[in-house]
């Protein structure tokens, strides 16, 4: 099982982040039905009010779980992911992806 953490940095302004979240809302149910997908959740900062938290108001962090790299690669080639990428290209500045496996 692989865990993918994708940090998506949007253009400044709440409307850009919301536009990306709206696009995720459209595809999450479909992605969760893909073969090999065990989790797919867009996350945003929680204003916890603690001193040790860093906030990124123009970021979305995707937490994904995939059975294998092959399943992840197939996911990236689906029509709904291609449509998502096209829909958000004006709102997203950059994306950093980490693919993780259990450390112990």
Curated annotation (Swiss-Prot):
Pfam families: ABM. Residues 2-100 form the ABM domain. PROSITE patterns: ABM (PS51725). The keyword Lipid metabolism does not apply. GO terms for molecular function: oxidoreductase activity; protein homodimerization activity. It catalyses: menadiol + 2 O2 = menadione + 2 superoxide + 2 H(+). GO terms for cellular component: cytosol. Its EC number is 1.-.-.-. It is an enzyme of class 1 (oxidoreductase). Keywords: Oxidoreductase. Does not appear to require metal ions or other cofactors for catalysis. The reaction is insensitive to heptyl-4-hydroxyquinoline-N-oxide (HOQNO), a typical inhibitor of single electron reduction reactions. GO terms for biological process: response to acidic pH. Can oxidize menadiol to menadione. May work in concert with MdaB to form a quinone redox cycle. PANTHER family: ABM DOMAIN-CONTAINING PROTEIN (PTHR33336:SF3), QUINOL MONOOXYGENASE YGIN-RELATED (PTHR33336). Homodimer. This is Probable quinol monooxygenase YgiN. The lineage of its organism: Bacteria, Pseudomonadati, Pseudomonadota, Gammaproteobacteria, Enterobacterales.
